[in-house]
Amino acid sequence: MSNTIVVVGAGVIGLTSALLLSKNKGNKITVVAKHMPGDYDVEYASPFAGANHSPMATEESSEWERRTWYEFKRLVEEVPEAGVHFQKSRIQRRNVDTEKAQRSGFPDALFSKEPWFKNMFEDFREQHPSEVIPGYDSGCEFTSVCINTAIYLPWLLGQCIKNGVIVKRAILNDISEAKKLSHAGKTPNIIVNATGLGSYKLGGVEDKTMAPARGQIVVVRNESSPMLLTSGVEDGGADVMYLMQRAAGGGTILGGTYDVGNWESQPDPNIANRIMQRIVEVRPEIANGKGVKGLSVIRHAVGMRPWRKDGVRIEEEKLDDETWIVHNYGHSGWGYQGSYGCAENVVQLVDKVGKAAKSKL
């Protein structure tokens, strides 16, 4: 069954959705977006991601991340030009953080003491207490992937174009404006809304349960492996600590912050100093023992994760008698690691509403 589809948004969620939809050669797909791979803008979260695959969902909601893991694993093994590589990941937990998360009702599976993903990662193991960073109570490690977003996003766009997807730049004030933007010259019967944080103010959506989860990072030339992710830090309420070395010379990401509701787009030098100081304390070899002065900074950056109070929104909505909307937004900090699983869900919904629309003709 063929559909005329306009995908609004060209971040990792929009492009992955377009790619999987394009596998049906009957679909006529147009991607429209204000920002494209190669752009660096605080509104465009995807380039600022680490990015990696560190499961965050509960086991009951884990299917999106499970499906995506196997696709990223395939890309490492078969498509090296995608900019994804295997990298060992070390997770460090503090009991105070995990207990707080449990009380809040929003536990992060990544820091669970009995994580569901221990059976997904073949070499998963709990660390011996002697391996755990001072100040943390327990840890685990496994081989995951790290993604060079500067390579991966253009690769993803190229795969879409290879499959016949047409890409346009546009700024939409209302989701309904996408009805006039199909390259096929006719009204699309389906619009995929993959605008991320843009859904907060996009007319026709205006989802006020959306908010930025501000992330500040430092990108350095220094190399360091394995990846490091911690459940929390002693100082700085919105501060977290992580490190990941991107594939193919993409630099090493030092983080960071997870500050829900903070719209500040400029890097804070005090936060930057805290980020770097923490990293050189737990991983002094990254700077050859020279402390912060031994870090070769490429840039300081801020990205806005598309946080949503009730989690990701993937559902269909009737716009009018001609067109349906399929929403795919609100992924917060796990857009990459849920991208393929969520896109598969989008394909299912597109098939569902496409059949429903045609049955009424």
From Swiss-Prot:
Its cofactor is FAD. Anthranilate 1 binds at Y242, R305. Glycans are attached at N193, N222. The N-terminus is blocked. Keywords: FAD, Flavoprotein, Glycoprotein, Oxidoreductase, Peroxisome, Signal. GO terms for cellular component: peroxisomal matrix; peroxisome. SUPFAM superfamilies: FAD-linked reductases, C-terminal domain, Nucleotide-binding domain. Capable of converting cephalosporin C (CPC) into 7-beta-(5-carboxy-5-oxopentanamido)-cephalosporinic acid, an initial material of different beta-lactam antibiotics. It catalyses: a D-alpha-amino acid + O2 + H2O = a 2-oxocarboxylate + H2O2 + NH4(+). Residues 1-22 form the signal peptide. Belongs to the DAMOX/DASOX family. Catalyzes the oxidative deamination of D-amino acids with broad substrate specificity. Enables the organism to utilize D-amino acids as a source of nutrients. This is D-amino-acid oxidase. It comes from Fusarium vanettenii (Neocosmospora pisi). The lineage of its organism: Eukaryota, Fungi, Dikarya, Ascomycota, Pezizomycotina.
